[in-house]
Amino acid sequence: MSSAKRRLYSLIQNATEPYAFEPDLAVNLDIADLINQTGGNLPREAAFAIVRKVNDRNPTVAYLALNLLDICVKNCGYAFRLQIASKEFLNELVRRFPERPPSRLNKIQVMILSLIEEWRKTICRVDRYKEDLGFIRDMHRLLSYKGYTFPEIDKENLAVLSQKSVLKTAEELEKEDREAMSAKLQELIRRGTPADLAEANKLMKVMAGYDTEQKQKYKEHVLVDLEKVKRKAALFGEMLNEVSESDKLASGDLYDELAYSLKAAQRKVDKILEEMSPEDDSYVTVSDLKSLIASLLTQYDHLLEGDFSSARTVAADNNSLLQATTESAKSNSKTSANASNTQSAMDLLIDLDIGSDAQSPSLPASSSQMPTSSFNMESLSQSLLGTVEAPAEVGAISLTESFNSPVSNSSPNVPINNFTSTCAFENSHLNFQITPKSKTRDQVVLLATYTNLSPYDTVENLQSFIAVPKKYNLVLQPQSGTNLSPLQKDGIYQEMIVTKLLDVTELPVRFKLTYKVNGRSQEYTGQSSIRLL
């Protein structure tokens, strides 16, 4: 046993000692740091050592282990999250859940349900590699189907894992992807089935040619993020110009939050500029953006001090700098066409912070992923007690047989093709997905499908309102219906035709959903980015 593994087991033992009674945050963070620093097989060792403690008969040990698990998910990277999203781990996590919920859940069961609900609402929606976390969503549906009710999660807890994507350099994006691919490759080789080994072979080929094929995508992604920063800076400048001498700026207000955000972005812009060559087409644009941010922060400092004369002088310079960044960006439009097209489309629809829905360069699609659209509850429930490649003590609640073989029950309304379904919205009652049916160079036919996730409640009077950027044309066909019976999969569908796309690979959409459950009206709005590849 390696020294890192011995230290890991020792720390986990210390963190879950029954006499501790309360979690030791320092030890828990030490474990998370050890996982991040060591890598290799340690994330898997840690995940399964923790889940064994979760199943300890001593409730204090289980309580401490769940707190440790929560800390690790919040502080560890993709390699650890890949393990907690595996069937084997999830089956172990719910091993002590009976097939039907008891009249009263114990504290440990409630904590487990809370964690699964939190993961589903956060990392399964906003994580850069959320496609590899599909079994968490599937376990959530399975438990809901069996009658378990998930507790509400505090906004403070959701905020930790739902943070907007931060500005990263091309080098940081590449490093993050390489680490994620390495972790995924190791897991595929460990499982060792023929399908996994074939997938591992494909992934190794991708990794071998990654530098040349992906660098341009990283640069385009950085340019898109810088455009968001510029828009935020422009908004901040407009707000500062409207501040009068009677206004009072205070710590913690909106001005302070925007200033803090731009200060954080300023450091990243400096780093991006360092990685660029003066010969790069975007060098002048990034340099002007750096000057604009510095000037805006100076203006803000003058306003805080009550020096309105100096603030007005700086404001005049800011307008010139903003115009300069706009002009230099236009001059580079041909070079960064993909980046600017993506951003302009988003600008027509989405608010200032759209990072969580923007698609980053990501891992290649894997056959080991389980898309939400292929999950079938009825087929799953019929084989709950079937053979599962997990420890023999796995209880009545478990996901189905093969890691690589999702259960499927194709609806005639759902397209059977190689396109990826996008989950645009999901809550305890409704799942809303959009899937491309066919695509040409400038047109795509999309199918919106609606599924009732509740085992008890009927969704009534469902109405959807969908919009795309004004530069595209959208034709909406009528909905197939307005009501969804309990657990009815793809019970309502609607076809959409979008034209004037011109080789677009992602389509931003904005939507509004209204429906009734138990006589109560529900209304939700949101946005998503639909992959057209």
Swiss-Prot record:
Modified residues (Phosphoserine): S320
Keyword Nucleus: no
Gene Ontology CC terms, in alphabetical order: cytosol; Golgi apparatus; trans-Golgi network; trans-Golgi network membrane
Record-level Gene Ontology MF annotations: phosphatidylinositol binding; ubiquitin binding
Domain of life: Eukaryota
Span of domain VHS: 15-151
Subcellular location: Golgi apparatus, trans-Golgi network
Biological process, per Gene Ontology: Golgi to endosome transport; Golgi to vacuole transport; protein transport to vacuole involved in ubiquitin-dependent protein catabolic process via the multivesicular body sorting pathway
Keywords, comma-separated and alphabetical: Golgi apparatus, Phosphoprotein, Protein transport, Transport
Family as reported in the entry's similarity comment: Belongs to the GGA protein family.
Protein name, entry field: Probable ADP-ribosylation factor-binding protein C25H2.16c
Organism (species): Schizosaccharomyces pombe (strain 972 / ATCC 24843) (Fission yeast)
